[in-house]
């Protein structure tokens, strides 16, 4: 199934929502390290309160969940073999870009080389799913030949049966 431009853009948006929010969630959840309670139940409740009453954490979390919802909706009409590599690979790139913008160390030249190779690979996945007009014509021509061959085989088989039983 060929992916439309809208489907590809929706998957890129999902990757941006997932990858772009990860460094923000990491930074905002640093307050969890300071939470210390005597029992695991109180610890859990205090951690939930610390996270979900913190708008610095809550906004990226909600955006991340919007990405998950968009992914779910997009999967209904998109080929899974295209959706998974686009979202997962580009999410890593968006994580590195946003992390770098926030001042994190992203790993230097090797990370940049990895991002370039990832974009090239995703581009190949996307373009291989598109159907170029002349390839569609070749496919139709090939199907016609296959149908002709199939019909010929059926005629010969039915002729052989009638000779055997006739």
Curated annotation (Swiss-Prot):
It is found in: Membrane. The chain crosses the membrane at residues 1-21, 82-102, 112-132. GO terms for cellular component: membrane. The keyword Transmembrane applies. Keywords: Membrane, Transmembrane, Transmembrane helix. The keyword Endoplasmic reticulum does not apply. Pfam families: TMEM234. It is a multi-pass membrane protein. Its main location: membrane. InterPro entries: TMEM234 (IPR018908). Belongs to the TMEM234 family. This is Transmembrane protein 234.
């Amino acid at each position: 199934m060929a992916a439309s431009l809208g489907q590809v853009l929706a998957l890129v948006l999902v990757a941006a929502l997932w990858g772009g929010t990860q460094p923000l969630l990491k930074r905002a959840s640093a307050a969890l390290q300071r939470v210390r309670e005597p029992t695991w139940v109180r610890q859990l409740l205090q951690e939930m309160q610390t996270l979900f009453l913190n708008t610095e954490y809550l906004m990226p979390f909600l955006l991340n969940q919007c990405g998950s919802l968009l992914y779910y909706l997009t999967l209904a009409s998109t080929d899974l073999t295209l959706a998974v590599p686009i979202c997962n690979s580009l999410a890593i790139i968006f994580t590195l870009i946003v992390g770098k913008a926030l001042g994190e160390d992203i790993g230097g030249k090797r990370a940049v080389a990895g991002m370039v190779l990832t974009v090239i690979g995703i581009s190949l996945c996307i373009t291989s799913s598109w159907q170029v007009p002349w390839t569609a014509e070749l496919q139709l021509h090939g199907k016609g030949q296959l149908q002709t061959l199939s019909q010929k085989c059926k005629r010969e088989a039915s002729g052989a049966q009638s000779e055997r039983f006739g």
